[in-house]
UniProtKB/Swiss-Prot annotation:
<keyword id="KW-0732">Signal</keyword>
<dbReference type="GO" id="GO:0006952">
    <property type="term" value="P:defense response"/>
</dbReference>
<keyword id="KW-0325">Glycoprotein</keyword>
<dbReference type="GO" id="GO:0051591">
    <property type="term" value="P:response to cAMP"/>
</dbReference>
<dbReference type="Pfam" id="PF08030">
    <property type="entry name" value="NAD_binding_6"/>
</dbReference>
<feature type="topological domain" description="Extracellular">
    <location>
        <begin position="1063"/>
        <end position="1076"/>
    </location>
</feature>
<feature type="binding site">
    <location>
        <position position="843"/>
    </location>
    <ligand>
        <name>Ca(2+) 1</name>
    </ligand>
</feature>
<feature type="transmembrane region" description="Helical">
    <location>
        <begin position="1077"/>
        <end position="1097"/>
    </location>
</feature>
<feature type="glycosylation site" description="N-linked (GlcNAc...) asparagine">
    <location>
        <position position="537"/>
    </location>
</feature>
<dbReference type="GO" id="GO:0016175">
    <property type="term" value="F:superoxide-generating NAD(P)H oxidase activity"/>
</dbReference>
<keyword id="KW-0521">NADP</keyword>
<dbReference type="Pfam" id="PF13833">
    <property type="entry name" value="EF-hand_8"/>
</dbReference>
<feature type="binding site">
    <location>
        <position position="832"/>
    </location>
    <ligand>
        <name>Ca(2+) 1</name>
    </ligand>
</feature>
<feature type="region of interest" description="Peroxidase-like; mediates peroxidase activity">
    <location>
        <begin position="30"/>
        <end position="596"/>
    </location>
</feature>
<dbReference type="InterPro" id="IPR018247">
    <property type="entry name" value="EF_Hand_1_Ca_BS"/>
</dbReference>
<keyword id="KW-1015">Disulfide bond</keyword>
<keyword id="KW-0472">Membrane</keyword>
Length: 1548
């Protein structure tokens, strides 16, 4: 084998180590030797890692773990550590060392140990071997609680170990495993740099050159709190190379000694070599100090410690492993602990042992060890002289006897971990041995080739037998279970026992012979032989003399041993007597003083929505103040008007309702009128002569309330500002009653009783509703159970309410008509038999019975009597004209006066009464009977039929011929297959020439008829049945929504469960789950769900994407129209999860605030470093001084603002405020990104969810910005019934669209960026565009208010619009079919309005169209929903000369709700439609059906009517339930080999 030259090896080592200088530069190349690395690497050129920082301990004996891998042995396998400590190591202090070893040697041993090994640093993830304290322990459990546990965290281990029995856990050494002065210079290059001054080769000093500077953050010095005083922080701790060099002032003194010795050598070298630079001076001084340290430790201190010398040094042995063994750590530390005295003397060079200052400025003869752990700014060590005195005192003081006894300063008052200020050093060392997996005492003896004692008494004859008995009892007399630590202590007396001596000797031999940089190794080029000899002759006494600068005679030659006759003997062997008492155990409360602040912070965060609510209230207030200024003049005029003839007051409408300001006027003719503050009449009460009026006054709570009870009316409850104002009104009312001969009865009662006695409008309406149900149940033969039951309350209030009668206005309102309509006047006058101006329920019932159950003679006689205005028994032509005009008024005035006169003449002429001026009842009945017979059966128009009525000039005939071809079955008809009824021989033939037939002619050839009879659904009676039906309809209508919400929710639950399970049970060990399981599961799970929700909520606002997708097949599965609702749902779910996320972190913050720093350093290794200070950060640090905390608070604030301002109530008050605050979403996402970027618990993951939706949303926004938007002037605006606003505006040049398409508009008065989609109701041929907008939301409601009246003259007064579109729909394909069926549900009719007008226009021009027939079916719950469409359908009917359009209207709300207006529609419609061939209420020729459309029979009959048509298009728009029924009917009909029905639908 080739041997390398030493120079080559040196160069190779320098290159490999990289330690060529302070920063690896070329400066060190000028040095004649290879500079040793600070971290221990590359000492051994074959095994580079040996002795390096972080290298694992090397076992000399196999591990002894409970599972053979890493689990430590605990109770009950082994005894309790505290019991063992008390039994084996408790004893009397004050016994001197058998060989007069000095205290300086003890602490020098600790210093040497800190140079080669450090395993005290807690490991991560945190594992605990807590020490259970026996109940009643005098130190740790004086109160006998029995639940005291001293925490013990297992040490840091090599992560590559602990995986199998062949690779058990090994602890990692946190310093270099070489005797290389790392306790002086640190164990890393950066640590050494932090200690250096980089000037003159010296270590950096503080203000006093004899002291190093204070500990700084880069050094990471261990800064445990002072257990005696609780003082903490780095202030007062010196910067040393040893992490725990400040544990005791005795270790500090040795650290200061070597600090000063290095600087002394640097100064000496600088004087000798003035041309050397800092690096050369430092490395030469360092080299010399390390060599001196090695020499003293191995050749001076170790022999005095072991009473043995090492073999002669024979040279470097590269194949010898010098790694520190765990057995050495325990053997050395425990033997040192037996020698530590309870106190330490201080003396000067003249042998004067001085007094020391203690807490409270009391003096004692020595420093008490237990009160000087981690002490800051020790008053006894403020100067160099005092440090020198401490070193001299330790050199003269004899240590404790080397036996099994450990003084109480270590056994009971060692610095404690966690919240405990004290712990048991021996018990902790026993746990440390178990943590290391140390073998038993017997196994170690075998491994080192030593004899095993046969029994307990053979251990050591010098040990107290009681100690052996107590120890043996704890081990159950099993000597094989005796642990290494206690066995080594028990075998020692005066000197380390055989086992400890063998372990220590073996370790130092390997340290010396395996170190390539050992000072005696002449091959490393460090020293010459002369320098080596000089170093060998240097002792610690020489170091002390050089540093302290004293006479050598003040010290014995060997400072580690004091021999008789040596200078300065100690006054006496120190005992605990005369020394201060050890500061007792204290248990820290990390959360002390933080509870109020934490509670206030949580409350403040919870109040963020309230703050936002207050802010929204301020905004609403200022907005309302501007509005009030505009109405100030109006209010003043109202007040003046009210002051003249009215009394202001507040009306109480009922419980849980807000009182409103009103004005009461007592008018002439016994009239009491109620107005609002705008002088709009709210209520008029007409009193009758001699009518009794009851007045009830409140007699408490300020006497401001009165109750006015008027017969046949609901009560009026008034609240006045003061009793005086109420008295003034009572006086006016009294004068009013006296003037008009009215009776007034006055009573008093409490205000609460007055409110309870009042019959409010709502109460009356509820009672009347049930009464109407019973009335119609009798008339319409409805089951009484369906009608409901009367309340069982028989109180006076109910009896009074049941006696009330309907006024003329209430009667008109019940019919849905105007009070001034002639029909209302006529019917009311007829029904009011007693002429008292009110309509009783019996009178109302009589008129209903005639309408519904009367014979044709009864009905005609009733009509005859209604319009026989002069009551002469004859109906004149003028009275007949009045009757017809009343019908026309109800029918929206669809015929002019001239046309009506012509109709009357035609009817007289057709009936043969053209020569009569008056009709008897018989004549009138004959006229109606004849028309009723003709209108009951009407022949269906055949395919392509048109031109009907062209030859008829009579208007009435034309109306008959153009009537929508609906065929209703007679009561006697039976249903036939496919919905086709039997032929009707008396039905006239319509279509072509058949339209010209006179009334009364019979059809010779029957034709197929459409089945259009409405399906009456029976109302479910039982509560459960109603709920089930409600649930079924809900699922039917929202099945797509439910599926999408279920899928989205499943994803959210999935990501929640994934993250919660991962961080709770499957994540890499980090202690966070063990520390705060509930908090981490809640916070991590909700964080993932919130990230997903807040990311994908952006897709619900991608309008252009949604517009595109709505036209694809995906619309069948995804309800794109519900994007805004889905947006709200996601937002609400996200904010709930965000609150839970915050609650989870509130739990986390509390737990982190009460967790020791050692645990937090494991959980957050990138944030915290365990420096022993224990104290965690306060709660406010987590909330306000961290990026996640501060951004989290800001996120809560932003969410509070956005959610409060987005509430429905505030949007109605200030939509602009909602729109502006909602743009905070940009800040929201910025904070979300920053919030997770800190990687406190996990790496940022928000971008994983956010990236794709953000790109899509950004692209969608760019499309919106690039789209052309045209400013349009509104030509006409009209407010239609049912809350519908009609807007007609200019058609931009080049604006092309198809019927059925929709646009997006923005009103400039409501904001230029807010667009809403609406379907065009104008036809493509029209010059203007029109929209019918129903007020269902805040924007559409405000739009209706804005266009209620123009601000200027003409169209210029209307706000302009922005127009965006048009956009396509599936309904524009209607023209591709010969026959199309349009089915609209509710407001879903709007797409078809444009289609109908477009169809009629094209047909009137004679355009060639494939479409020959349109059937328009509209399904609506109540006639209120189609009032606004009457004009459009009427226009279509008037222009439809070819009979292309057939209109069906189905009202589904009848027996199920018993709406009075709908029920009256049913009655009047069936009776009066036969008179004028128009619907009584809509004015349309189409028949209004009551029930649900029979789609399947209708489609079957449609095949019979159009047999030549092979494809029929069906287009439906409305709620999902309706479109589903249409789809189902199409599927059933398509099973037949006949016409194919192609269904296209849109849901809203």
């Amino acid at each position: 084998m080739l041997r390398a030259r030493p120079e080559a090896l040196m160069l190779l080592g320098a290159l490999l180590t990289g330690s060529l200088g302070p920063s690896g530069n070329q400066d060190a190349l000028s040095l004649p030797w290879e500079v040793q690395r600070y971290d221990g690497w590359f000492n051994n050129l074959r095994h580079h890692e040996r002795g390096a920082v972080g290298c694992r301990l090397q076992r000399r004996v196999p591990a002894n773990y409970a599972d053979g891998v890493y689990q430590a042995l605990e109770e009950p396998q082994l005894p309790n550590p505290r019991r063992l400590s008390n039994a084996a190591t408790r004893g009397i202090a004050g016994l001197p060392s058998l060989h007069n070893r000095t205290v300086l040697g003890v602490f020098f041993g600790y210093h040497v140990l800190s140079d080669v090994v450090s395993v005290e640093t807690p490991g991560c993830p945190a594992e605990f071997l807590n020490i259970r304290i026996p109940p009643g322990d005098p130190v740790f459990d004086p109160d006998q609680r029995g639940d005291v546990v001293l925490p013990f965290q297992r040490s840091r281990w090599d992560p590559e170990t602990g995986r199998s029995p062949s690779n058990p856990r090994d602890l990692a050494n946190q310093v270099t495993g070489w005797l290389d002065g790392s306790a002086i210079y640190g164990s890393s290059h950066s640590w050494s740099d932090a200690l250096r001054s980089f000037s003159g080769g010296q270590l950096a000093s503080g203000p006093d050159p004899a002291f190093p500077r204070d500990s700084q953050n880069p050094l990471l010095m261990w800064a445990a709190p002072d257990p005696a005083t609780g003082q903490n922080g780095p202030r007062g701790l010196y910067a040393f190379g040893a992490e725990r060099g400040n544990r005791e002032p005795f270790l500090q003194a040795l650290g200061l000694l070597w600090f000063r010795y290095h600087n002394l050598w640097a100064q000496r070298l600088a004087r000798q070599h003035p041309d050397w630079e800092d690096e050369e001076l430092f490395q030469h001084a360092r080299k010399r100090v390390i060599a001196t340290y090695q020499n003293i430790a191995v050749y001076e201190w170790l022999p005095s410690f072991l009473q043995k010398t090492l073999p002669e040094y024979t040279g470097y042995r590269p194949f010898l492993d010098p790694s520190i063994s765990p057995e050495f750590v325990v053997a050395s530390e425990q033997f040192f602990s037996t020698m530590v005295p309870p106190g330490v003397y201080m003396r000067n060079a003249s042998c004067h042992f001085r007094k020391v200052l203690n807490k409270g400025f009391q003096s004692s003869q020595a420093l008490r060890v237990c009160n000087n752990y981690w002490i800051r700014e020790n008053p006894n060590l403020n100067s160099t002289q005092e440090v020198n005195e401490l070193l001299l005192g330790m050199a003269s003081q004899i240590s404790e006897l080397e036996d099994n006894i450990v003084v109480e300063d270590l056994r009971d008052y060692w610095p404690g971990p966690g919240k405990f200020s004290r712990t048991d050093y021996v018990a902790s060392s026993i746990q440390r041995g178990r943590d290391m997996g140390l073998p038993s005492y017997s196994q170690a003896l075998l491994a080192f080739g030593l004899d095993i004692p046969r029994n307990w008494s053979d251990l050591n004859p010098n040990v107290d037998p009681q100690v052996l008995e107590a120890t043996a009892a704890l081990y159950n007399q099993d000597l094989s279970q005796l642990e290494l630590l206690l066995g080594g202590l028990l075998e020692s007396h005066g000197d380390p026992g055989p086992l400890f001596s063998a372990i220590v000797l073996d370790q130092f031999v390997r340290l010396r012979d395996g170190d390539r940089y050992w000072f005696e190794n002449t091959r490393n080029g460090l020293f010459s032989k002369k320098e080596i000899e000089d170093i060998r002759n240097t002792t610690l006494r020489d170091v002390l003399v050089a540093v302290i600068n004293i006479d050598p005679s003040a010290l014995q030659p060997n400072v580690f041993v004091w021999h008789k006759g040596a200078p300065c003997p100690q006054p006496k062997q120190l005992t605990t007597d005369g020394l201060p008492q050890c500061a007792p155990l204290t248990v820290l409360d990390f959360f002390e003083g933080s509870s109020p602040g934490f509670a206030i912070t949580i409350i403040a965060l919870c109040c963020l929505p309230l703050v936002s609510l207050l802010l929204s209230g301020v905004v609403a207030y200022f907005r309302g103040r501007e509005h009030k200024k505009l109405q100030k003049k109006l209010k003043e005029s109202v007040k003046k008007e009210a002051a003249k003839d009215g009394v202001p007051a507040m009306e109480w409408p009922g419980p849980k309702e807000r009182s409103s300001p009103i004005i009461i006027q007592l008018l002439s003719d016994r009239c009491l009128q109620v107005l609002n503050r705008h002088l709009t009449v709210l209520r008029v009460v007409q009193l009758q002569p001699l009518q009794q009026v009851n007045l009830i006054l409140s007699n408490n709570r300020g006497c401001r309330t009165l109750l006015l009870k008027i017969p046949k009316e609901y009560d009026l409850v008034l609240l006045f500002s003061s009793e005086e104002e109420r008295g003034a009104f009572v006086q006016q009312l009294w004068d009013f009653c006296v003037r008009w001969a009215l009776g007034l009865h006055v009573a008093e009662m409490s205000e609460k009783e007055l409110f309870r006695k009042a019959v409010t409008k709502q109460q009356r309406e509820r009672i009347l509703e049930i009464f109407f149900r019973h009335l119609f149940a009798q008339v319409l033969d409805i089951n009484q159970a369906d009608a409901g039951t009367l309340p069982l309350d028989s109180s006076q209030k109910v009896r009074e309410a049941l006696t009330c009668e309907l006024s003329r206005a209430e009667f008109a309102e019940s019919l849905g008509l105007k009070p001034q309509d002639m029909f209302v006047e006529s019917m009311f006058s007829l029904a009011d038999k007693d002429g008292n101006g009110y309509l009783s329920f019996r009178e109302f019932l009589d008129i209903l019975v005639v309408f519904m159950k009367g014979s044709p003679e009864d009905k005609s006689r009733l009509m005859f009597t209604m319009y026989d205005l002069d009551e002469n028994g004859f109906l004149s032509k003028d009275e007949f004209f009045t009757m017809m005009r009343s019908f026309i008024e109800i029918s929206n005035n669809c015929l002019s006066k001239a046309q009506l006169a012509e109709v009357v003449e035609s009817m007289f002429r057709e009936s043969g009464f053209q020569d009569k001026e008056e009709l008897t009842w018989e004549d009138f009945h004959f006229m109606l009977r004849d028309h009723d017979s003709e209108l009951r059966f009407t022949q269906l128009c055949v395919k392509g039929g048109g031109g009907g009525g062209n030859g008829i000039r009579d208007i009435f005939k034309q109306n008959i011929s153009c009537r929508v071809s609906f065929i209703t079955r007679t009561p006697g008809e039976r249903s036939h297959p496919q919905g086709l009824g039997p032929p009707a021989p008396e039905a006239p033939e319509l279509g072509g020439p058949g339209l010209k037939k006179r009334f009364g002619k019979k059809a010779a050839v029957p034709t197929p008829r459409l089945y259009t009879e409405a399906l009456q659904e029976k109302m479910q009676r039982g509560f459960l049945a109603q709920k089930l039906q409600q649930y079924k309809r809900f699922v039917e209508n929202y099945r797509r929504h439910i599926v999408c919400v279920a899928i989205f929710s499943a994803i959210c639950v999935g990501v929640f469960a994934d993250r919660a399970y991962y961080y709770g049970f499957a994540s890499p060990p980090s202690d966070i789950a063990q520390t705060t399981l509930v908090g981490i599961i809640l916070s991590r799970g909700t964080a993932a769900s919130v990230s997903f929700m807040f990311s994908y909520i952006l897709l619900t606002m991608c309008r252009n994407l949604i517009t595109f997708l709505r036209e694809t097949f995906l619309n069948r599965y995804v309800p794109f129209d519900a994007a805004v609702d889905f947006h709200r749902w996601i937002a609400m779910a996200a904010v709930v999860l965000a609150i839970l996320h915050s609650a989870g972190h509130a739990v986390n913050v509390y737990i982190f605030s009460v967790s020791p720093l050692s645990l937090l350093a494991c959980i957050f290794p990138n944030v915290f470093v365990n420096d022993g200070s224990k104290l965690p950060q306060k709660f406010y640090w987590w909330f306000f001084q961290t990026v996640p905390g501060m951004t989290g608070v800001l996120l809560l604030l932003v969410l509070a603002i956005m959610y409060v301002f987005a509430s429905h109530h505030f949007r109605r008050r200030s939509f602009r405020g909602f729109w502006l605050t909602h743009h905070l979403y940009i800040l929201l996402y910025a904070l979300l990104i920053i919030h997770g970027s800190y990687a406190l618990i996990q790496l940022p993951t928000f971008h994983i969810y956010f990236l794709v939706p953000a790109i899509i949303y950004g692209g969608d926004k760019l499309v919106s910005l690039s789209r052309k938007k045209v400013e349009i002037s509104v030509v006409k605006a009209e407010l239609l019934p049912s809350g519908v606003t009609y807007l007609q505006f200019q058609r931009p040049q080049g604006f092309e669209y198809k019927s059925g398409q929709w646009v997006r508009i923005a009103c400039l008065a409501l904001g230029t960026t807010e667009y809403h989609p609406f379907t065009l109701t104008s036809a493509p041929h029209e010059d203007t565009l029109s929209l019918h907008i129903r007020a269902v939301g805040p924007w559409t409601t405000r739009l209706r208010e804005i266009y209620s009246s123009p601000k200027g003259n003409g169209c210029a007064g209307y706000p302009k619009l922005y127009l965006d579109g048009p956009f396509g729909e599936g309904h524009q394909e209607w023209h591709k079919f010969e026959v199309s069926v349009l089915v609209g549900g509710g407001i879903g009719v709007t797409p078809f309005a444009s289609i109908l007008k477009d169809l009629v226009f094209k047909s009137s021009l004679g355009s060639q169209m494939l479409c020959k027939k349109i059937y328009f079916i509209w399904v609506t719950r109540t006639q209120r929903q189609f009032e606004w469409l009457a004009d459009i359908i009427q226009e279509v009917e008037e222009n439809d000369h070819q009979d292309l359009v057939s209109v069906h209207i189905y009202v589904t709300q009848l027996a199920e709700k018993f709406d009075l207006r709908t029920t009256m529609l049913y009655i009047c419609e069936r009776h009066f439609q036969k008179v004028l061939n128009r619907s009584l209420f809509t004015g349309l020729r189409s028949i209004t059906h009551f029930g649900r459309p029979p789609f399947e029979p209708f489609f079957n009959s449609l095949q019979e009517v159009h047999p030549q048509v092979r494809k029929i298009g069906v287009f439906s728009c409305g709620p999902p339930g309706m479109t589903k029924n249409v789809e189902k009917a199409c599927q059933l009909v398509n099973r037949q080999d006949r016409a194919h029905f192609m269904h296209h639908y849109e849901n809203f």
